[in-house]
Amino acid sequence: YNCDFLASGHTVIDSDILQYYSEHVSDPIEKRGIGGDIWIWKYPNYTKDYCVLADPARGDGEDYSGLQIMDVESLEQVAEFKGKVDTQTFGRMCVALATEYNNALLVIDNKNIGWSTVQVALDSGYKNLYYSYKNDPYMDENIHIRKNYDMVNKENMVPGLTTTTRTRPVYISKLEMYFREKSPVIHSKRLLNELYIFMWTDGKAQAQRGYSDDLVMSWAMGLYIRDTALRMRQVGIEIMKRTLTNVHKSVYKVQPKGSEQWQMGIGKNGEIESLRWLL
């Protein structure tokens, strides 16, 4: 697994951690597509939630498109694609795999040629496509929650994930943090090979010249999305639950005749108020 790069000491992920992962990669249980470029390690479990992360490329020259499918809860890599395909074909592949994996959240990097792949997903009517906020320098779920951003109303959003010079370092930070904790469950030797040549160069994390980092960046996108968009969605659900819980029914309790018939219970602690002033 490109062990000759270990001595450089400039890999984004620590060499000891890469060595740990090199001992845990495994062959896929199925290879699909022309050339067998779609690798499957786990078939969909319909009790789980998945996220499909797509990094499109032109499909010619040295550019590869990369795709990862992540089990959102366990951070396990369940499927992967790396290959040279046109953006339309890649878009159809993204939608098909996302649909197969329980209508997974489909996250497509929309920079440059990525819009063509996003358009395929839009034209297909896929319902669980990820949207980014317009004019957002970076995504901070805490800021968005405080601003009460609406995750359903798409008027202020654009389809796909917008990667910028400000968000890319955040992706890398998530990648470093999770791998340092050895939290992701990685099966792919292709991804591991890319991690071995994913280096710090002049302060920027990128593949060594002549190599690609499509799989690394799509995985980093997934970790970022897991901690932002998916957290925002869950927080929104929790806020709704709390709101519904705090809506108390007003129940009129009939009092017996006699001395207590002009009393009314108030509050939640059994307090009693006399209504005799109404007489």
Predicted features, each with a name:
Residues 1-134, 141, 165, 169-173, ...:
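RNase H-like, metal-dependent nuclease domains and their acidic two-metal-ion catalytic environment used
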